[in-house]
């Protein structure tokens, strides 16, 4: 389940990306994921995720990103949600995998 907040267009795009990601990463379907769209530039990041409960995640994404960057960022953070569900908490391997998969999945999403 995906819940979103923020601008009119971003929640719609977030739903599209999430539905696509369920096909790529079926384990995401076991979690409740909330996506907040907000200004993160002052924090020096464009997105992050945190586990709220065993099967609940909060993903925050910079609201002013260009569409392509928004898609990459949301995919990246959803990969982190799946990694957490699997118990992969080692930061270096998490980031390497998320960066590798974000490009692959973004290309598939655009096709």
Question: Where would I find each of the regions flagged by the language model?
Answer:
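Short pre-active-site segment immediately N-terminal to the catalytic Zn-binding motif
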Residues: 57-74, 88-89
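Catalytic Zn2+-binding segment of zinc metalloproteases
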Residues: 78-93, 97
């Amino acid at each position: 389940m995906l819940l979103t907040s923020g601008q009119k267009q971003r929640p719609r795009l977030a739903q599209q990306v999430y539905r696509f990601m369920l096909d790529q990463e079926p384990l995401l379907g076991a979690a409740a994921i909330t996506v907040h769209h907000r200004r993160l530039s002052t924090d020096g990041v464009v997105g992050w995720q945190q586990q709220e409960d065993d099967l609940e995640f909060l993903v925050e994404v910079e609201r002013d990103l260009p569409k392509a960057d928004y898609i990459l960022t949301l995919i990246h953070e959803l990969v982190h949600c799946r990694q957490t569900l699997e118990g992969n908490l080692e930061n270096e391997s998490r980031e390497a995998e998320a960066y590798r998969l974000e490009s692959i999945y973004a290309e598939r999403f655009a096709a």
